[in-house]
C-alpha cells in the first residue's frame, strides 16, 4: 500500500513515538500516545496497529535489556508470563486481522473506558515487595495466566498493556513497582513480537514510517528506563497517573 506522509508529519510522528517510548518504559501505556499519532498521520487502522507494533517492539527490546542488566525483574516469573503473553498476543493479532476498520474502532471505544476504570481503581499501588522469592506451581500458573490475559489484550487493543502488567504483578503476585515493571517488560516484549510476526506475515508494517519511529522509540525507552530504575516508585507512580490522564483524554476525544 502506497502511504505518503509529509516531512512535517513525519517529524511529528518521530517526536510522538519517542515520547511514547519514554512513557512506556517508565509506566507502560505508550500506545496511548503512539496509536493516535499514527492514525492522525493518516495510516489506516490495520497499518497503524502493525507499524506501531514494529516501533514498540524495537523500543521495548532496549528497555527490557536495561531492566535485566540492573536486576530489576524476577526472570523466572517474567519468562513464564512471556510464554503466556506470546500465545495470547498471537491469537489477538490474528483476531484483529479478521476484523474491519470500523469494528476495530468500535472495539477501542468499548474497551478503553473499561481500561480507564481499572487503572483509576488501582492507581495507588503498594510498593513493598511481598514476594518470598520462591516459585511454586500456583505462582507459575498465575504468571502464565497474567501473561495470557494481558497478551490477548495487547494483541487485540494494546494501550495500557504495561500499566496493566504492573497492576497485575503488584496486586496479584506481591512484587514492588520496580520489579513489577521489569516483569512487565519481559511480558510486553514477548507480546509485541508475537503480534509483530503476525503483522509482518501480512505485509502490514509500513517500514519507511516505522524505521525512523522505531529509532525514536528506542531513544525514548532508554531514557525512560533510566529514570524508572534510578527514581523507582517516586517516578513510576506519577507516570502511571499521566498515563491515566492520557487514556481519559483519548476517551473524551473519541466521544466528540
Locations of regions flagged by a protein language model:
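Selective hydrophobic functional segments
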Residues: 50-103, 107-110, 192-242
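Transmembrane helix-loop junction
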Residues: 40, 93, 97, 106, ...
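Hydrophobic alpha-helical transmembrane segments in multi-pass integral membrane proteins
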Residues: 147-157, 195-203, 210, 247-256
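Residue-level signature of the transmembrane alpha-helical core
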Residues: 14, 18, 22, 53, ...
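Selected transmembrane alpha-helices and immediately adjacent juxtamembrane segments
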Residues: 1-44, 130-181
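Transmembrane helix exit motif
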Residues: 62-72, 109-135, 248-256
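Residues within membrane-spanning alpha-helices of integral membrane proteins
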Residues: 10, 53, 108-112, 116, ...
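Small-residue hotspots at the loop-to-helix junctions and early N-terminal turns
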Residues: 46-50, 181-185
